[in-house]
Amino acid sequence: MTPYTGLIDRYRQRLPVSGAVRIISLCEGNTPLIRLQNIPEVIERDVRLYVKYEGLNPTGSFKDRGMTVAVTKAVDEGSRAVICASTGNTSASAAAYAARAGIAAFVLIPEGKIALGKLAQAMVAGAIVLQIRGNFDAGMRLVKEVAARAPVTIVNSINPYRLQGQKTAAFEIIEALGRAPDFHCIPVGNAGNITAHWMGYKEFFRDGLAKTLPRMCGYQASGAAPFLRGHTVDDPETVATAIRIGHPQSWDPARQANKESQGWFDELSDEEILAAQKLLAEREGVFCEPASAASVGGALRDLASAKIPAGSLVVCTLTGHGLKDPDIAIRQSSARRVAVDATLAAVERAIMDNMV
């Protein structure tokens, strides 16, 4: 059996990477597509509901799919450094792939506004972390200005190679199911991922590898929902830090994906997002970060209203692992922590008192 070596090797003929380049990979991709068994019973709906668990990529998020291609191309073109603005996941991924490549990484993050797990990832991988007194959108503006003056390669999703890598998730979904889903539900922040998935679905459809295309359903947090407002949001705020973005860089292509697929954008409150995160963990054992849960929360609400009809095949993207932001999960958990004496009798009594 040939070992899996990463998505560039797996899909090289569909990616803008020539045969002679040095591939910068951490064996990203090939993430599980998990059928939810218990939640459909809880909501009492006839639905085939799956989650694409991108939190099992090397740095714990979907960003690795695009980063392997972006950093591979940067190194091939002679770049000695990469730069990004980030709400956390991009910085973690850029730092790891830059370390793998042996080049520098500069990451701009909003001071005090990203989860510590993500900050730790960037720091331990050796990135130069610049904490700016501003939000992601201010950081993105600065990254563009710096890249116009300094010899650094931007690895945010405005880098077209990022989306080329991220489209492979759609390939994997079709290969796992033997078809495209009826609906694909996905969290939306900077909007590169909904754009990339639509690219991937269209490519397989064009080449006869799928007979249908899904409707793309993008979900934003209410405090950071420019697609719902119809304009950018200057001061986005949400507990779902990964989608706390008011000026999406992929605005136009995401709108196009929405229109072409006859899908929709919708918004969820922070309370709805956290409830979906908790439901996934408690009922299915799948732990994702809050932003990821927006896809499931949105899908469940649309199933309840029959906007997504009964009998549908639905895939929800879980963009990042729950360990990215454990503090929020601990604060909202209903699990009891019981202090007991270190004796058999005390432990046995605690177990019997808490049996379901």
Across the structure, where does each feature detected by a protein language model lie?
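PLP-dependent amino-acid enzyme catalytic core
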Residues: 1-356
